[in-house]
Amino acid sequence: MTTNYKVTELFCIIDEFCKHFDAENTGNLLEDNSGVKRRRRAASLSDSEIMTILLYFHFGTFRNFKHYYLFFIKGTMKSYFPKAVSYNRFVELESRVFFQLMFFLNLGAFGRCTGITFVDSTMIPVCHNLRRYANKVFKGIATDGKGTMGWCHGFKLHLACNDRGEIIAFVLIGANVSDKDTNVFKVLAKRLYGKLFADKGYISQKLFDFLFEDGIQLVTGLRVNMKNKLMPFYDRMMLRKRYIIETINDMLKNTAQIVHSRHRSVSNFIMNLISVLGAYCFFDNKSKALQGYCIEDTKQLSLF
């Protein structure tokens, strides 16, 4: 379990962002011309407190959000959140901070492209394969797809990270969408430049040409049945550093619990997903590829 200092750190960063976010939006939002009166009543918990509670859940050892909220937030951390509402009310308030949390990820939490980017996809199952026909929450939304670990009913998460282990961008698609789909990279590669290192599942001449037009060089390994070709020594070494993106996927699933089958609505599934990505940005044990940009500093030459 993390220390109470982490709660204070998270809240201060998020609250400062929410103040700037609200100041920018004041008077700039579109008016509601539907004629329906809205009270615009403030909740007992502020938006920054709701976001802090959502993110802090993924730092601890709790496997169940309900127990975390009832016994930890309303119990141990009662002095930090004296106006905590009931659990049912908090679940209703989660979706209120969706836009604030998305803006916070893109403007205040995610890293920036350094010219060295790693990309990978991971399956996000929503239920067991045998229960996919009985699942009603994601009926018509989740799809069946096959990955390296077998068949999956759910979604596929594409992640792009830099050499410091910081997430740059993400895309959530159906599980049956190919990794080589250019529509995925129309969103994923908006902020990228330089070299993009990927596994063999991204080998596609169409995708390579699409990225090259935007100034991005796709670097992948070679399949067994492909002709051998010369590759710069630096690119070969950086392909070995793809463990960074694999480590991120492992931390998201095993530490931050991005995958579980207890979702009762699509909106809560989305809130859990972006909360996990936001919490990872504040993890202290991120993997790094390079201490500098010199290959000798990584001591990879000793492998030969």
Predicted stretch roles:
Residues 1-304:
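Short alpha-helical elements
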